[in-house]
Amino acid sequence: ARLPAIGVQSAREAGVNPTTFNMFNGHASVPTGEDGPTHADPQSLQLVQDNFPKGACITITPLEVDEIWPLTVRALSLRPAVFAPFVVRPSYALMDREALGADPAIKAVNGVYYLRRAKGNAAGTVIVQGAGGGRIVVEKVLPALNAGGPDLNVLYVASRELFEALPKEEHDKILPPEMLRTAIGITDFTLPT
């Protein structure tokens, strides 16, 4: 992926308008299939995230299949040199977003969206990335929170790069800096080091 990125960057500097290199990563993270632990790769995101100049590579980690196309269209509209989608297994049932209090799937195009908004003063913020951990949060944690657990904001990271591409005002509107003071992150990928 690095060589196509260098080639695309050079071509654009020379006035040529090359196409984006699409590096499809299939269903990555721990629960990738019925035998998930035998062919999972939690390191894969680390190989492409933060290893390119800003804007040269966009990754997406949708939580559900209905987020894939909006994320893809948004990512490709920014014309990155490399587009690296990590998609979920199509057999996952769609969550009832309205019942859970989650944002509509189209909000994934912002890169970060709410799975749950605190009803009052939030006791904290949970930021989730990766469909494996995300599914556990949707199926087990959100119902428990809604049934009387701590009043938390829960956000999902569908694309760090798309979120970072937003204007600062929009960025701060979705995830205000003060929320980060009480935030914890949950991911099923190994973070870049």
Where are these regions (language model features)?
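Thiamine diphosphate
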Residues: V16-F21, N25-Q46, F52-K54, T59, ...
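Long, structured ligand/cofactor-binding scaffold of large enzymes
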Residues: A1-R12
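TRNA-recognition modules of translation machinery and tRNA-sensing kinases, especially anticodon-binding
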Residues: L63
